[in-house]
Amino acid sequence: MEKVFEKLMYASRWIMAPIYLGLSLILFALGIKFFQEIFHLIPNIFEIAEVDLVLITLSLIDITLVGGLLIMVMFSGYENFVSQLDVGESSEKLNWLGKMDAGSLKNKVAASIVAISSIHLLKVFMNAENIANDKIMWYLLIHITFVLSAFAMGYLDKITRK
């Protein structure tokens, strides 16, 4: 009975596989939004103000960072919790595949969230005259929370690996 239970529990990790695959649909949706922004920008490129161009650029960088975060979570999560990715040893293979454990993934995700939050905060500051001061304060507090959390997670990971 115990062996059957353990095999069933071990096999249940495959429930995560379609979830990781589903994240690729979100990645596809981000790609659509990315190019939608560019297609809206191109016809108006000569009329758009410099500040607005910078804000659009920051939005595109934000989308790119979220996409990179998704790829990192999809591949590392699949490798750590479901099965090893067998993509061969071609020159296209990402050099970090198979080398990122759950702790490293957690730290990279935290760093990515801080980077995404930084871009978002920069967009808020560039548009500060249109945003209430209390909202700016909350954006800043949330960003500081992300930074401190990432630092604490990295520090805890460092002291537990010793």
UniProtKB/Swiss-Prot annotation:
InterPro entries: UPF0114 (IPR005134), UPF0114_bac (IPR020761)
Top-rank taxon, per record: Bacteria
Keywords: Cell membrane, Membrane, Transmembrane, Transmembrane helix
One Pfam family per UniProt: UPF0114
Cellular-component GO terms for this entry: plasma membrane
Membrane topology: Multi-pass membrane protein
TM helices/strands, residue ranges: 15-35, 53-73, 136-156
Subcellular location: Cell membrane
Xref: PANTHER family: UPF0114 PROTEIN YQHA
Family assignment from sequence similarity: Belongs to the UPF0114 family.
Name of the protein this chain belongs to: UPF0114 protein Sden_0436
Originating species: Shewanella denitrificans (strain OS217 / ATCC BAA-1090 / DSM 15013)
